[in-house]
């Protein structure tokens, strides 16, 4: 999957470049080679995303070290005006030396994405968070905010998504079916019966009180200024799209399910000629798989 993600990053970078405006000469980006920043060090921004603001691109991503996949530094930020030459802006969101904090050093912090809120003038970061020492059990969404694009960002909270809320695309008949589902009847995974139950909302019901799981994720701001949180949920079996509040710092409770039981992650979304397109990968760990789009 790392090769796949690298290819996607190169493709997205190329697309953004052709849509941008810059008269600066560009140096070639050579696939497979170390990509240095302005200090000559490799760009350390894994699982990242690029935000364009006031003529500058900002690349946010996970700082990774050689010894662990856990977050020992936090979220890095790099800036560029041409998408080839990147300046290290430093740590945008730091993990902390406090084990009582959700973002304690050693937690798992992945897929940071940043959007700008024109109403508040704030920059808002969302990310996938797993609590220190808990593996991938927490499946939380974290949020932080800053007055400037590169940060520093102030951590606000983390948690599951839309606790106590059913998807808005579940009609009365679907809710009636949901009421009949009992997890004890589907303890064996990957059977046709289990898959059908997941499709009908088995895990939505299981997680209703505590909130929906949120792992691989992205953000999208529509033309009307409404922002959406798109994430892999329900044990990575179903994608969900959740509406964010006007300040982009919380969820409104409105969300829909996409490709139930489809087993997709790593979502990316864009709009072209009035149609929304979503690209995802399958769930095969670090092994490559075919892209899907809808």
Model-derived segments and their meaning:
Residues 76, 83, 87-118, 129:
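Blade-loop segments of beta-propeller domains
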Residues 39-41, 104-105, 208-210, 257-262:
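Surface loop/turn motifs at the tips and blade-to-blade linkers of beta-strand repeat domains
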Residues 87-93, 154-161, 252-259:
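Beta-propeller fold detector
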Residues 19-20:
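C-terminal motif of bacterial Sec signal peptides marking the signal peptidase cleavage site
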């Amino acid at each position: 999957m790392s090769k796949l993600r690298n290819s996607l990053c190169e493709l997205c970078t190329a697309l953004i470049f052709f849509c941008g405006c810059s008269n600066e000469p560009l140096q070639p980006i050579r696939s497979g080679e170390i990509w240095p920043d302005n200090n000559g060090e490799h760009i350390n921004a894994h699982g990242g995303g690029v935000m364009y603001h006031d003529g500058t691109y900002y690349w946010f991503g996970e700082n990774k070290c050689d010894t662990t996949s856990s977050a020992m530094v936090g979220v890095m930020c790099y800036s560029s005006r041409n998408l080839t030459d990147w300046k290290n802006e430093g740590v945008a969101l730091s993990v902390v030396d406090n084990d009582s904090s959700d973002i304690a050093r050693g937690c798992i912090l992945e897929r940071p994405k940043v959007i700008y809120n024109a109403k508040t003038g704030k920059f808002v970061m969302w990310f996938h968070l797993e609590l220190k020492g808990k593996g991938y059990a927490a499946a939380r969404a974290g949020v932080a905010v800053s007055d400037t694009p590169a940060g520093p960002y102030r951590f606000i909270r983390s948690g599951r998504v839309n606790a106590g809320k059913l998807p808005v695309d579940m009609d009365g008949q679907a809710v009636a079916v949901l009421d009949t589902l009992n997890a004890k009847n589907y303890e064996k995974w990957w059977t046709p019966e289990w898959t059908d139950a997941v499709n009908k909302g088995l895990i939505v019901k299981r997680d209703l009180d505590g909130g929906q799981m949120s792992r691989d994720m992205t953000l999208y701001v529509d033309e009307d200024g409404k922002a959406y949180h798109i994430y892999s949920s329900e044990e990575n079996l179903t994608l969900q799209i959740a509406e964010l509040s006007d300040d982009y710092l919380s969820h409104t409770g409105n969300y829909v399910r996409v490709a139930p039981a489809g087993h997709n992650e790593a979502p990316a979304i864009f709009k072209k000629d009035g149609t929304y397109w979503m690209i995802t990968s399958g769930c095969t760990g670090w092994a490559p798989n075919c892209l899907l789009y809808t």
